[in-house]
Amino acid sequence: MSLVTVGIGDLAVTGDPRAVIVTHGLGSCIALVAWDPGLRVGGMLHFQLPASALSPERALDAPGTFADTGIPLLFHRLYARGCRKEALVVKAAGGGSFNDRGGAFDIGRRNHAAMWRILRHARVAVVAEDVGGSRSRTVRLFLDSGRVTVQSGDQVAPL
């Protein structure tokens, strides 16, 4: 097994069947996972904020930080590996809320809304998601099978 760790604002794409792509500590951030079962190529993005307009300079240095720059980059890299949009199995997890202020301060909800807006516009379907709540998550994508798990504490569940 080859472990590929995706940090905050980062992404990874691989076709190594021995690889497991993992990201830890998802709070309000969202992990977007995509896997092509025919090619056995997959990727994961761990984005932190909904819009690059918040920091255009940071978007240039770390486009994976933002939904509006990271999501297109993830799909661009998957397409560069031969993946086709209609073949991709796309899943998402994270987007939690950890304060009672709501509104503009509810980054998890804003991240989730931005993700859906971008994916709808691109006509990309999400087949499963585990979002919201107030728990931290670890997400794993197993490249040999496309299996995605979400771990919160000691509980591991398929997505």
Curated annotation (Swiss-Prot):
<dbReference type="InterPro" id="IPR011324">
    <property type="entry name" value="Cytotoxic_necrot_fac-like_cat"/>
</dbReference>
<keyword id="KW-0145">Chemotaxis</keyword>
<dbReference type="GO" id="GO:0006935">
    <property type="term" value="P:chemotaxis"/>
</dbReference>
<dbReference type="Pfam" id="PF03975">
    <property type="entry name" value="CheD"/>
</dbReference>
<dbReference type="InterPro" id="IPR005659">
    <property type="entry name" value="Chemorcpt_Glu_NH3ase_CheD"/>
</dbReference>
<comment type="similarity">
    <text>Belongs to the CheD family.</text>
</comment>
<protein>
    <recommendedName>
        <fullName>Probable chemoreceptor glutamine deamidase CheD 2</fullName>
        <ecNumber>3.5.1.44</ecNumber>
    </recommendedName>
</protein>
<keyword id="KW-0378">Hydrolase</keyword>
<comment type="function">
    <text>Probably deamidates glutamine residues to glutamate on methyl-accepting chemotaxis receptors (MCPs), playing an important role in chemotaxis.</text>
</comment>
<dbReference type="GO" id="GO:0050568">
    <property type="term" value="F:protein-glutamine glutaminase activity"/>
</dbReference>
<dbReference type="InterPro" id="IPR038592">
    <property type="entry name" value="CheD-like_sf"/>
</dbReference>
